Amino acid sequence: MESRVLTGGATAIRGGLPLLRKPAAVMKFTTAAHAISRDFPAGAVTAKPVGPLIAGPNLIWGRQLRPAILLETSPKRESIKPCSAAASSSAGSSDSSGDAKVGFFNKATLTTGFFFFMWYFLNVIFNILNKKIYNYFPYPYFVSVIHLAVGVVYCLVSWGVGLPKRAPIDSTQLKLLTPVAFCHALGHVTSNVSFAAVRVSFTHTVKALEPFFNAAASQFILGQQIPLALWLSLAPVVLGVSMASLTELSFNWLGFTSAMISNISFTYRSIYSKKAMTDMDSTNVYAYISIIALIFCLPPAIFIEGPQLLQHGFNDAIAKVGLTKFVTDLFWVGMFYHLYNQVATNTLERVAPLTHAVGNVLKRVFVIGFSIVIFGNKISTQTGIGTCIAIAGVAIYSFIKAKMEEEKRQKKAA
């Protein structure tokens, strides 16, 4: 996608300029420079560099930045687009339009795929380590605080070194992010309560309903029309994940209710985080959400689990695994939690909330599969069939969604 340059600044020009010999021609940068020097006296035309050639308000960000030279001839400006540096010395090394070719790793599809891969990978590690901690330290409120606290420290250090640069936040953005952070905190705590109360697979079975919550919210809250075909394509996804989870199924009302509350909370967070990204990049958005969410999580952790932790909670955990392993486990589970959520937020910035939710369901298949292997659970035929159905459902959804997007582009082009 070519970045187009729009600038309100006037290009410097002196009166009485003759027209260019070929006003409609688009030439290479070096050819343009020779033509200008040949056809006009020195100082007759001032070329104004735009985009990355100068600093200031003319810097335009697109999928790919291309430098351009604007020449003002009569009432009309013409853009002379240069080829790449290599192309300027070798004719035929680029296409006739002079557009710089997009590198393989700059393709949007590949980049989005990489985000999804890292999201899945980090989430699998987090879920396995998190469940191992709950096996000897069943205090989900405190562990939830540790998850967020490690992430907040990570954000503060990143801001300190300028990676990324901290975006200032005003009162309007704070008001927008506060309810999002509250739902993030509520969804996070209730998810951990469910993970501590039941097996990993059961929690993910209930949370597989998230796409339906997202679809309903997108249609009835945001006013987006979700076609029937997309609704139907979500059915095999949820059914498949549910089937894959049944081999570890151990019903528990606390775990079930907590997972349902988590679904509703994360649905609100996903949709309104998308709105918050209009004025701030996703990395800074998630950093501020983590800080505010930590404040919300502290009171319940102190009042609900504080007395138990001081009496025997910490001592029991240290007696079972040792102080070093206990502290190390808490640190790494917090780090993986923050990283996988950061990547998930970056992924949400690139796709629609419903697509993000379906990807989240497929992620659960990976989590269930790895948890079966790590914790020594037997894999049944039903688990394998359910996994295949879920993957097939995601493929059907992706095909229908891509076809709909292509039809929209064709209508706009017409």
UniProtKB/Swiss-Prot annotation:
Membrane topology: Multi-pass membrane protein
GO biological process, one term: transmembrane transport
InterPro entries xrefs: Sugar_P_trans_dom (IPR004853), Tpt_PEP_transl (IPR004696), TPT_transporter (IPR050186)
Stretches that traverse the bilayer: 109-129, 142-162, 220-240, 285-304, 383-403
Main location: plastid
Recorded GO CC terms: chloroplast membrane; Golgi apparatus
Chloroplast intermembrane side: 79-108, 163-219, 305-382
Keywords linked to the UniProt accession: Chloroplast, Membrane, Plastid, Transit peptide, Transmembrane, Transmembrane helix, Transport
The keyword Transport is annotated on this UniProt entry: yes
Membrane topology (Lumenal): 130-141, 241-284, 404-414
Localization, UniProt: Plastid, Chloroplast membrane
Pfam families reported for this sequence: TPT (PF03151)
Presequence range in chain numbering: 1-78
Purpose of the protein: Mediates the export of fixed carbons from the chloroplasts into the cytosol in the form of triose phosphates.
UniProt family annotation: Belongs to the TPT transporter family. TPT (TC 2.A.7.9) subfamily.
Protein name: Triose phosphate/phosphate translocator, chloroplastic
